Structures are given as C-alpha cells and as structure tokens.
Amino acid sequence: MMNMQNMMRQAQKLQKQMEQKQADLAASQFTGKSAQELVTVTFTGDKKLISIDYKEAVVDPEDIETLQDMTTQAINDALSQVDDATKKIMGAFAGKMPF
C-alpha cells in the first residue's frame, strides 16, 4: 500500500512541475523571421500571435504574393520554434512518470 501512495505523491509532484513548465512556456515569446528578415512575427508559447512586423522594402502593392509568402515563412518559423520548445520541455517528463 505504501508503494501506491508514494507513486501517487510522485505523480502529483510531477503534474505540478509540468503545469509550471507549461505556464512558463505559455509566457515565453518566439520570433519567426522570413528571408532577409523582411517579415518578423512573434507568438507566445501557447501559439497566440503577438505581432507582425514588415520592413518597408517588402511592402509593394504590385507584388502582394511575396509579402504573403514571407509572412507565411515567418509564421511557420515561429510556430516551429514553439513546437520544438514544447517537445523539449514536455519530453523531459516522459521518463519520470512512476508508472
């Protein structure tokens, strides 16, 4: 019976640690950039968009497709960083579960 109680306590402790890491991740910011850094976007760790910034050189009414492509590049870059950080932080808990 004691083993089960210890396992439950350890699981609860790990859950609290994981919740704190998730909160830390959500409070973090990740900035993605396009080629030549003409477009930058910033997301929180819980994938909320904070900002999109465009350099003047990329804003051309005659070539809206380039602006769209660079925006997509920057967004995908930032979200990839969020995913990598999430895997790294949450993956650390996988081997610590007592069951």
Curated annotation (Swiss-Prot):
<comment type="subunit">
    <text>Homodimer.</text>
</comment>
<dbReference type="GO" id="GO:0043590">
    <property type="term" value="C:bacterial nucleoid"/>
</dbReference>
<dbReference type="Pfam" id="PF02575">
    <property type="entry name" value="YbaB_DNA_bd"/>
</dbReference>
<protein>
    <recommendedName>
        <fullName>Nucleoid-associated protein SAG1747</fullName>
    </recommendedName>
</protein>
<feature type="region of interest" description="Disordered">
    <location>
        <begin position="1"/>
        <end position="20"/>
    </location>
</feature>
<keyword id="KW-0238">DNA-binding</keyword>
<comment type="function">
    <text>Binds to DNA and alters its conformation. May be involved in regulation of gene expression, nucleoid organization and DNA protection.</text>
</comment>
<dbReference type="GO" id="GO:0005829">
    <property type="term" value="C:cytosol"/>
</dbReference>
<dbReference type="InterPro" id="IPR036894">
    <property type="entry name" value="YbaB-like_sf"/>
</dbReference>
<dbReference type="GO" id="GO:0003677">
    <property type="term" value="F:DNA binding"/>
</dbReference>
<dbReference type="InterPro" id="IPR004401">
    <property type="entry name" value="YbaB/EbfC"/>
</dbReference>
<feature type="compositionally biased region" description="Low complexity">
    <location>
        <begin position="1"/>
        <end position="10"/>
    </location>
</feature>
<comment type="similarity">
    <text>Belongs to the YbaB/EbfC family.</text>
</comment>
<keyword id="KW-0963">Cytoplasm</keyword>
